[in-house]
């Protein structure tokens, strides 16, 4: 298939960005979206850099920078806004799991980086997602002694609680929730992490401290507030539900009442 790509190009976080249009031809419907971008970059490298165009600010003319790692829907690095949707038109998949069969010959595809205050652009389609790491560092862990493996196996956990905890732990931290939210809120990410630990006996000990610390860090890093539009749930590639946000709100309120 032949496609027209409108790709966001931006030198760095402070530079003014713009769209550039490219043509790619003979793309297999079995190719992944990232493989299609690889083909585009091979094409741009073969064409070489036009110093005059770069000097005039008309064309970046170099390969398009985009982030990726595992290409298996695990790491969350391949974070792109495709035709106005986080990770593209398919449901419950990451960008690297999106295949070109979801598009038609002659389509125009608009590709942008994440759009959230907490994710500044590094270059082109690459954004800085360190904010999520900082939120995790604020409390997304268990620091109390939990014993060895035999001790963990000896603690009975109801199956329902274990399943809910694993649902939250499925979060890959891709940032689709914050990028999709009209307020740029990271509540679904924080809620998934808080919920996955608060449901377990080992994580319950620090539940109050964790909820307060992670919410405070989220606010400090410039993420917005949740207004219950549920766009985050719709675009999450792991289909993490807003029930975790409800649990985070309960944990946070109880923690504040204990102060």
Label each region the model flagged.
Residues 1-26:
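Eukaryote-biased recognition of intrinsically disordered, low-complexity regulatory segments
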Residues 31-59, 109-259:
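Ferredoxin-type iron-sulfur electron-transfer modules in oxidoreductases and energy-metabolism complexes
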């Amino acid at each position: 298939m032949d496609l027209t790509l409108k790709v966001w190009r931006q030198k760095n976080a402070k530079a003014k960005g713009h769209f550039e249009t490219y043509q790619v031809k003979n793309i297999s419907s079995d190719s992944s979206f990232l493989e299609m971008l690889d083909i585009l970059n091979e094409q741009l490298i073969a064409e070489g850099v036009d110093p005059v165009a770069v000097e005039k600010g008309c064309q970046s003319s170099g390969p398009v920078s985009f982030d990726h790692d595992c290409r298996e829907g695990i790491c969350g690095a391949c974070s792109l806004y495709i035709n106005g949707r986080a990770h593209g038109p398919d449901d419950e998949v990451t960008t690297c799991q999106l295949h070109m069969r979801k598009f038609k010959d002659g389509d125009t595809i608009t590709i942008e980086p994440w759009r959230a205050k907490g994710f500044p652009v590094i270059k082109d389609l690459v954004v800085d997602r360190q904010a999520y790491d900082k939120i995790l560092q604020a409390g997304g862990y268990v620091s109390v002694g939990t014993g060895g493996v035999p001790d963990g196996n000896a603690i009975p956990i109801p199956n329902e609680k274990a399943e809910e905890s694993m649902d939250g732990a499925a979060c890959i931290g891709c940032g689709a929730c914050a990028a999709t939210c009209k307020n740029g809120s990271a509540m679904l990410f924080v809620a998934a992490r808080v919920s996955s630990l608060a449901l377990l006996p080992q994580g319950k000990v620090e539940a109050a401290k964790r909820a307060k610390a992670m919410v405070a860090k989220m606010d400090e890093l410039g993420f917005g507030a949740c207004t219950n539009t549920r766009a985050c749930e719709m675009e999450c590639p792991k289909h993490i539900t807003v029930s975790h946000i409800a649990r985070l709100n309960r944990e946070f309120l109880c923690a504040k009442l204990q102060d």
